[in-house]
From Swiss-Prot:
The modification N6-(pyridoxal phosphate)lysine is found at K50. One of its GO terms (molecular function) is 1-aminocyclopropane-1-carboxylate deaminase activity. The active site is at S77. GO terms for biological process: 1-aminocyclopropane-1-carboxylate metabolic process; amine catabolic process. Catalyzes a cyclopropane ring-opening reaction, the irreversible conversion of 1-aminocyclopropane-1-carboxylate (ACC) to ammonia and alpha-ketobutyrate. Allows growth on ACC as a nitrogen source. Its EC number is 3.5.99.7. This is 1-aminocyclopropane-1-carboxylate deaminase. Keywords: Hydrolase, Pyridoxal phosphate. It holds the Pfam family PALP. Belongs to the ACC deaminase/D-cysteine desulfhydrase family.
Length: 337
């Protein structure tokens, strides 16, 4: 599906799939849980899902003769960390807008984790006091113009690399990769669980798995707390990506499965249930999930297993998208473990 698109390698190769044996047994053993470790996909600044997307975006950035990657996220954005890492790797400058998306108070929140790594990698970090929104932001557009005014050649990458024209391609590749791994494993996964916020990871998976009719087996767990906007954006990206890869069929709103029950109390703030899911996964599997994204999708998957959402005997693949550095911004929350 991706043969005609240029790819700039930023990852090690296919990511490992491991069985979550102890977590599966803890939840009754009737559903078999697996994780695809996108969090271990690269040596670039702790890796993560954004690199899979950026592999199809960076060739366009280089071809444009730009010299500066310009992007945006929250204070503890995993995406902006990855932009900083890739900019360093390819010899570009990096301008990052970090908005106050999360109403979280921690004495070190803006000095540790992702934003610390971005600064170490040489990014020009601009803090902006604006609330959460997955759409195009004025502060980002102003940063692009500022780079131009100073003689730079900006290459704009939106939040999460999601509404970029090539933002969905990387996770079409994820689906193709899973199909190869399923042949090696000797079975197919019945469901794929993924955290959904800006939407292109979910959208790309939907398109990729639509090739063999499994688009509705991709179960998005909303972490945005703006699910209507998020679902609309996932569908828009999926449709655009389907055209790019010549899927040959139209995707509908019904093809986007988004479960809205776990994003509370608000984007970036973990509920008690999210915190318990983070601890449970860490203590049973040694696998770290973060309070913003993967902790909420892990909470969702655990709860869905408990509720019987997945039929007995199901094999469920959890897409671990990364994000562990952000947990440093929640040091007080987890001060006692």
């Amino acid at each position: 599906m991706l043969e005609k698109f240029e790819r700039y390698p930023l990852t090690f190769g296919p990511t490992h799939i491991e069985k979550l044996e102890r977590l599966s047994e803890h939840l009754g053993g009737k559903v078999q849980l697996y994780a695809k470790r996108e969090d271990c996909n690269s040596g670039l600044a702790f890796g993560g899902n954004k690199l899979r997307k950026l592999e199809y975006i960076i060739p366009d950035a280089i071809a444009s003769n730009a010299d500066t990657l310009v992007s945006i996220g929250g204070v503890q954005s995993n995406h902006t960390r990855m932009i900083a890492a890739v900019a360093a790797k390819i010899g570009f400058k990096c301008r990052l807008v970090q908005e106050s998306w999360v109403p979280h108070e921690d004495a070190v929140y803006d000095r540790v984790g992702n934003i610390l790594l971005s600064r170490i990698m040489g990014a020009d970090v601009q803090m902006v006091d604006e609330g959460f929104d997955i759409g195009i932001r004025q502060s980002w557009e102003e940063a692009i113009e500022d780079v131009k005014a100073k003689g730079g050649k900006p290459y704009p990458i939106p939040a999460g690399a999601s509404v970029h024209k090539y933002g969905g391609l990387g996770y079409v590749g994820f689906a193709e990769e899973v199909r190869v791994q399923e042949e090696e494993l000797g079975f197919k996964f019945d469901y794929i669980v993924v955290c959904t916020v800006t939407g292109s990871t979910h959208a790309g998976m939907t398109v990729g798995f639509a090739k063999d009719g499994r688009e509705r087996q991709v179960i998005g767990i909303d972490a945005s707390f703006t699910p209507a906007q998020t679902k609309a954006q996932v569908l828009e990206i999926a449709r655009r990506t389907a055209e790019l890869v010549e899927l040959g069929r139209e995707l509908s709103s019904d093809d986007i499965v988004l479960i809205e029950d776990y994003a509370y109390p608000v984007y970036g703030v973990p509920s008690d249930e999210t915190k318990e899911a983070i601890r449970l996964c860490a203590r049973l599997e040694g696998m770290i999930t973060d309070p913003v994204y993967e902790g909420k999708s892990m909470q969702g998957m655990i709860d869905l297993v408990k509720k019987g959402y997945f039929p007995e005997g199901s094999k469920v693949l959890y897409a671990h998208l990364g994000g562990a550095p952000a947990i440093n911004g929640y040091a007080y929350t987890f001060r006692n473990g």
